[in-house]
A protein has these predicted regions:
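Short beta-strand to alpha-helix junction loop
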Residues: 57-64, 101-119, 253
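Short hydrophobic core segments
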Residues: 10-12, 35, 154-169
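Glycine-rich FAD pyrophosphate-binding loop
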Residues: 26-49
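Central beta-strand plus flanking loop segment that forms part of the substrate or channel wall
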Residues: 181-210
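A short alpha-helix-loop-beta-strand transition element characteristic
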Residues: 67-87, 206-215, 270
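Conserved flavin/dinucleotide-binding core of flavoenzymes
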Residues: 2-4, 8, 19-20, 28, ...
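A conserved short coil-to-beta-strand element within the FAD-binding core of flavoproteins
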Residues: 131-146
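Flavin (primarily FAD) binding-site architecture
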Residues: 162-182
Length: 346
């Protein structure tokens, strides 16, 4: 193993929380290294080349951090399409419900939410972001500094920011000095959307709008249980997306989804020009392999043991699951990142 490289802060994970923390810390004068296991940035922010989100997509009224960030980065927002009726599916068949049952105003990001993380990554100092560097060990070293290992390399840092879900952190990183109570808690914190598949169907036009439908649906039959319009500004590109419990998707998932979209929206619904299934439960760096067998207790989000630094104030949790407000949202990820930055710079 190589000699340890000295740095101020190592950030583990290049999702929205990790990149936001790294940009802020670098801007405050800290020497920062960002280590990302995947071959891309973004984490659970992932968009197709057409700008359609396979991960986080929405922002909501009152979420000031993400709106401020989008404006600062020059990422435009637009309103989620809500106009039209909802389709409801249960054992009795498919019914059309007047109005949109899911009518909470929300906004999306032109070009996809991954535009936020792409822009943040571009703002980091050259050479500070290392992809395909899964961290395998964080230990307390000489002088109380934390030693971080990844791909046979080592870094020695004053602080480490764990910007990945707590259960993934304790599942993939050797943390021998972490107090047992913290490690046990982290292992039980469910990953937001970690057992969900997001399905995106793209069409030549938003034909459902012409029929007075919102592109929204609720189903008790599945596999998609909740469906929304995912179209870009002005309906271009035209798309619908739905959430499905990953456990309900079998080897014939694509055929299942096409059949359901046909039931919900008619023959044209069953014939998208493309269909993408993003099963987040199969992402090693998003969800532990045995996560489906763990209790999904979201009351543990923002737990005091995970919203406070560990290891004498040197190890900081910064994923959305550790946020004390807006946990699960991009806003929560930014709040957690900001908390870590304040603890390090304050």
């Amino acid at each position: 193993m190589s000699e340890a490289q000295e740095t101020d802060v190592v950030v583990v994970g290049a999702g929205i929380s990790g990149l936001a923390a790294a940009e802020a810390l670098a801007g405050a004068g800290s020497d920062v290294v960002v280590l990302e296991a995947r071959s891309r940035t973004g984490g659970r922010l992932l968009s197709t080349p057409e700008g359609l989100d396979l991960g986080a997509s929405w922002g909501w009224d009152g979420e000031a951090r993400v709106l401020t960030l989008a404006r600062r980065l020059g990422v435009a927002t637009y309103a989620q399409h809500l106009a039209g009726d909802t389709v409801v599916e249960d054992l009795g068949g498919v019914l059309r419900h007047p109005g949109n049952l899911i009518d909470v105003p929300a906004h999306r990001y032109a070009g996809g939410a991954a535009g936020l993380t792409d822009a943040l990554a571009r703002r980091l100092p050259a050479g500070s972001l290392l992809l395909e560097h899964p961290v395998d060990r964080v230990v307390v070293g000489a002088g109380g500094r934390l030693e971080v290992g990844a791909r046979g390399r080592r870094w020695r840092a004053r602080h480490v920011v764990l910007a990945l879900p707590p259960s993934v952190a304790v599942d993939t990183v050797d943390l021998p000095d972490l107090p047992g109570a913290v490690a046990r808690l982290a292992a039980t914190v469910p990953v937001w959307m970690g057992q969900v598949a997001k399905v995106v169907a793209v069409y030549d036009e938003p034909f459902w709008r012409h029929a007075g439908l919102a592109g929204a649906a609720a189903s008790r039959l599945g596999p998609l249980q909740e469906v929304h319009d995912l179209s870009g500004p002005g309906g271009d590109p035209a798309a619908i997306f739905g959430f499905a419990p990953a456990a309900l998707l079998g080897p014939d998932a694509e055929a299942q989804v096409r059949a359901q979209l046909g039931r919900l929206f008619g023959p044209r619904g069953a014939e998208p020009r493309s269909l993408t299934i993003a099963d987040w439960s199969r992402e090693r760096w998003t969800s532990p392999a045995d996560a489906a067998a763990r209790p999904a207790d979201r009351s543990r989000y923002g737990h005091p043991l995970l919203s406070a630094p560990a290891l004498d104030g040197r190890l900081h949790w910064a994923s959305t699951e550790t946020a004390t407000s807006y946990a699960g949202h991009v806003e929560g990820a930014l709040a957690a990142a900001g908390r870590a930055v304040d603890a390090i710079t304050g």
